[in-house]
C-alpha cells in the first residue's frame, strides 16, 4: 500500500500564521481561519436558500471553504498588499496557487482524487459556490479586524477599511443578513454576549 503525505501537509496549516506583517493581539493560523470560513460559508448558503430562493448545497460549500486555503501549506500565506500589489503579481500568484492545488490533489491515492479535486481545485467550483466562499473569506478577515480593534489594536484600521470595500464589491442579500444579524456581536465583550444569551 502506498503512503500519502496529504493529511500530514494539511496538518501543518496550523503552523502558518495569517497577517504576518501586522502586530496581532492574538495570532490566527490558516487552519483556524479555514474553520471559521467554513462555518460562515455554510451559514451564508443556508441563509441564501432559506431567505432568498437559493439552491445551493451548504455542506459542499462548507467543505470547499475548509480547503479554500489548503494550497498555502505549499505556498505560504502571502500578505495581501504583496499578493495584489499589481495585476501581474496577482496573475502569477494565481498560477502558483493552481499548481499547488494540483500538487495537493496528486498527493492523494488515485481512488480519492476525484472526490477531493472538486473541493480543492477552485476551477471546479460553480460561480455561485465561489461567490459564497469568497464572501465568507472576506467576512472572516473583517471579523478578525473587528476583534483586533476591539482589543485596542489600531494596526488593523487600514485593513478594516480595505475589507469594507471588498465586502461592498461582493455584497449579496445573504451577506447583508449575516452582517445585520451576526456581526455586531463581534464587537462585544464575553460578558455582553453572555448576558443576552441567558
From Swiss-Prot:
It catalyses: a 2'-deoxyribonucleoside 5'-phosphate + H2O = a 2'-deoxyribonucleoside + phosphate. One of its GO terms (cellular component) is cytoplasm. It is found in: Cytoplasm. It holds the Pfam family YfbR-like. Its EC number is 3.1.3.89. The record marks 18 as: Appears to be important in orienting the phosphate for catalysis. It comes from the Bacteria. Its cofactor is a divalent metal cation. It is an enzyme of class 3 (hydrolase). Residues 30-142 form the HD domain. A divalent metal cation binds at residues 33, 68-69, 137. One of its GO terms (molecular function) is 5'-deoxynucleotidase activity. Substrate binds at residues 18-19, 33, 69, 77-80, 137. SMART domains: HDc (SM00471). Coiled coil: none annotated. Belongs to the 5DNU family. Catalyzes the strictly specific dephosphorylation of 2'-deoxyribonucleoside 5'-monophosphates. Homodimer. This is 5'-deoxynucleotidase ETA_12010. It comes from Erwinia tasmaniensis (strain DSM 17950 / CFBP 7177 / CIP 109463 / NCPPB 4357 / Et1/99).
Amino acid at each position: 500500500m502506498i503512503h500519502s503525505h496529504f493529511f500530514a501537509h494539511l496538518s501543518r496549516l496550523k503552523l502558518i500564521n495569517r497577517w504576518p506583517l501586522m502586530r496581532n493581539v492574538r495570532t490566527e493560523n490558516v487552519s483556524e481561519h479555514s474553520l471559521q470560513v467554513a462555518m460562515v460559508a455554510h451559514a451564508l448558503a443556508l441563509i441564501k436558500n432559506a431567505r432568498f430562493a437559493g439552491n445551493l448545497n451548504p455542506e459542499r460549500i462548507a467543505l470547499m471553504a475548509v480547503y479554500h486555503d489548503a494550497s498555502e501549506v505549499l505556498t505560504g500565506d502571502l500578505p495581501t498588499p504583496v499578493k495584489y500589489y499589481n495585476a501581474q503579481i496577482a496573475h502569477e500568484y494565481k498560477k502558483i496557487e493552481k499548481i499547488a492545488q494540483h500538487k495537493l490533489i496528486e498527493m492523494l491515492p488515485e481512488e480519492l482524487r476525484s472526490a477531493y479535486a472538486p473541493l480543492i481545485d477552485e476551477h471546479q467550483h460553480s460561480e455561485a459556490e465561489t461567490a459564497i466562499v469568497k464572501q465568507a473569506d472576506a467576512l472572516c478577515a473583517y471579523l478578525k479586524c473587528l476583534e483586533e480593534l476591539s482589543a485596542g489594536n489600531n494596526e488593523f484600521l487600514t485593513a478594516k477599511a480595505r475589507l469594507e470595500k471588498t465586502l461592498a464589491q461582493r455584497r449579496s442579500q445573504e451577506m447583508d443578513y449575516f452582517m445585520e444579524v451576526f456581526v455586531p456581536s463581534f464587537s462585544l465583550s464575553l460578558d455582553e454576549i453572555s448576558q443576552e444569551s441567558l
